[in-house]
Curated annotation (Swiss-Prot):
Gene Ontology CC annotation, any one: plasma membrane
Membrane association type: Multi-pass membrane protein
GO biological process, one term: regulation of pH
The protein, known as: Putative Na(+)/H(+) antiporter NhaA homolog
UniProt main location, coarse: membrane
Length: 132
């Protein structure tokens, strides 16, 4: 835990000195993640802490290297990491998984309920915002 605190101070110093190289933040970020996970703290908190210290504006200029990194990893995060994170934290047990359970009427009822509910909600919002 103390090591994590020291690494957070290093992140603060990097931000204070307006260091804009991605390599420094990547190395320190990985070290912070490893130290926090080893201390028993969830890795998601590490990502939030790192995001607080990454400089976006340096002396009035937008740091394009961080925006390039964001655009580079955004599809990977949106289509792989985030769904995997949600699935793993949803509490679904894979030991009871079978094709029979996927094709059950309960599963189809849940899927249809979510799909139709989303469509009805969107249409209701559209109707409520329409000028009369």
């Amino acid at each position: 835990m103390f090591i994590s605190f020291v690494i957070i101070i290093i992140l603060f110093i990097l931000n204070y000195k307006q260091v804009k190289h991605l390599l420094y933040y990547t190395i320190v970020g990985v070290l912070l993640w490893v130290s926090m996970v080893e201390a028993g703290i969830h890795g998601t908190l590490c990502g939030a802490i790192i995001a607080l210290f990454i400089p976006v504006n340096i002396k009035g200029q937008i740091n394009s290297s961080f925006h390039k990194l964001e655009k580079l990893i955004q599809p990977f995060v949106n289509y792989f990491i985030l769904p995997l994170f949600v699935f793993m934290n949803s509490g679904v047990l894979l030991k009871d998984f079978s094709f029979r359970s996927v094709c059950s009427s309960l599963t189809f009822g849940i899927i249809l309920g979510l799909f139709i509910g989303k469509q009805l909600r969107s249409y209701a919002i559209f109707l409520s915002m329409r000028e009369v």
